[in-house]
C-alpha cells in the first residue's frame, strides 16, 4: 500500500456494502455526487472501521479495490487504512471461505480450548484473542459472510456444545 490510490474499481457487491454505510456516490438523477471535499471527509473518518466491516460482512474480505474505494470516499491514505485493516484479526485482506470460526485462545479459554471441536469442516479456523466470553470458556465465534442477510450469521457458541445463556 502506498500514499496514492491505485486504479482499481470495486465490485458491485463492494459498492453496495459501502453505500449502505457511507451513502451512495450518485444522486437520484444519476450525477456523481460531490462529497463535500476534505471537510466532509474529515467528519466521516470515524466510519473507517464500519466501512471495513461492511465489506467483510458482504464480500468476506477487504480487497484492494474495496480498500481503495473506502480511502477515496473518506479521503484516507491507503497505507493508513491498510494498517487499520491488518491490525484487526477479524478483518481478512485476502479471499477466505465464506465461513470462519474464531477460536478464543485467551487465558480462560486456552486451558480448555479445542479447535478440533469445530463442526463446520469447510470453515476457516482462526485462533483469535479474547472474544469476551470468559465465563463460557471455551468459546468460539462463527461468522458466515455473504451478499444476503441470511448468509451472514454471527453467532457465539461455546465449544462444549451447550447453548449460551440469553
Question: What residue ranges belong to the model's regions?
Answer:
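Short beta-strand scaffold segments in enzyme catalytic cores
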Residues: 138-142
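Small-residue-enriched alpha-helical segments and adjacent helix-cap loops
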Residues: 44, 48-136, 148
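Iron-sulfur (Fe-S) cluster-binding modules
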Residues: 1-58, 69, 78, 124-127, ...
Amino acid at each position: 500500500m502506498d500514499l496514492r490510490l491505485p486504479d482499481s474499481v470495486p465490485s458491485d457487491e463492494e459498492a453496495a456494502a459501502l453505500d449502505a454505510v457511507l451513502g451512495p456516490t450518485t444522486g437520484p438523477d444519476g450525477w456523481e455526487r460531490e462529497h463535500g471535499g476534505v471537510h466532509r471527509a474529515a467528519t466521516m473518518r470515524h466510519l473507517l472501521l464500519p466501512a471495513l466491516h461492511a465489506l467483510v460482512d458482504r464480500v468476506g474480505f477487504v480487497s484492494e479495490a474495496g480498500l481503495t474505494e473506502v480511502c477515496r470516499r473518506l479521503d484516507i491514505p491507503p497505507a493508513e487504512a491498510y494498517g487499520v485493516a491488518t491490525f484487526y484479526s477479524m478483518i481478512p485482506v485476502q479471499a477466505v471461505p465464506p465461513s470462519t470460526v474464531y477460536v478464543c485462545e485467551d487465558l480462560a479459554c486456552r486451558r480448555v480450548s479445542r479447535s478440533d471441536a469445530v463442526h463446520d469442516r469447510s470453515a476457516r479456523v482462526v485462533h483469535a484473542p479474547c472474544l469476551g466470553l470468559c465465563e463460557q470458556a471455551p468459546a468460539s465465534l462463527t461468522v458466515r459472510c455473504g451478499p444476503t442477510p441470511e448468509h451472514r450469521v454471527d453467532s457465539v457458541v461455546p465449544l462444549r456444545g451447550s447453548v449460551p445463556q440469553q
